[in-house]
């Protein structure tokens, strides 16, 4: 929620707003999606955040075995997925997961 609130919590700025913006941006060409290397070739990369292509300013945290935090500021929704998926390295898993989270955001977001 801290990132969705631009670094503020309960009216107090905890992290600089510009740092938050920079951390979820792919300003350098080599950080933008798509890129040639795996893993996650469909996603750009910020400061420990994976950034899907699109215009909704989404960003994701991806952990091992299919764990995700999906944040969509445009739809004002955060989706957290925990799990122990042994096939987490399956081809197109990231693309499918982002599509799934986008459907959730479209259905339940603002």
Question: What residue spans do the PLM features occupy?
Answer:
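Active-site-proximal binding-pocket segments
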Residues: 1-25
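Sec/Tat-exported extracytoplasmic proteins
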Residues: 3-7, 27, 53, 82, ...
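Short acidic-hydrophobic sequence patches enriched in Asp/Glu that either
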Residues: 15, 41, 96
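A short acidic/small-residue loop/turn micro-motif
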Residues: 85-87
């Amino acid at each position: 929620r801290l990132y969705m609130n631009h670094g503020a919590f309960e009216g107090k700025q905890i992290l600089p707003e510009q740092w938050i913006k920079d951390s979820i941006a792919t300003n350098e060409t080599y950080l933008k999606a798509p890129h040639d290397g795996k893993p996650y070739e469909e996603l750009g990369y910020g400061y420990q955040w994976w950034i899907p292509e699109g215009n909704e300013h989404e960003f994701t945290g991806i952990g091992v075995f299919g764990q995700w935090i999906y944040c969509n500021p445009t739809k004002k929704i955060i989706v957290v997925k925990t799990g122990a998926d042994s096939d987490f390295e399956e081809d197109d898993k990231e693309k499918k997961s982002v599509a799934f989270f986008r459907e959730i955001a479209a259905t339940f977001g603002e």
